[in-house]
């Protein structure tokens, strides 16, 4: 995966195998991109809340969600902040990106669409 292209558009319309959801570590998907994921993937949201309750979602730890339907997109949940009311920090983004680079091949990710990290509701 060495080709990076910047595109403007709706991440949910992406033709990529995997799409990235920017999340916090407290179990809230209340605005922006995360809210879009919560509405489209309610079963993932329920697991996310449970993982947060059990302190399994942390900065630098990525969670790949795959729906049982084979033709469905994969969602890479990427923590960009600890709490929804605090901004993202550059070191949080770097930790997540480093983990992505280290693990995308073993996870089977062949193509991916990222939203802008740490901006809008994240910034």
Task: Give, region by region, the residue ranges found by the protein language model.
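Macrodomain-like recognition of ADP-ribose-binding/processing modules
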Residues: 1-123
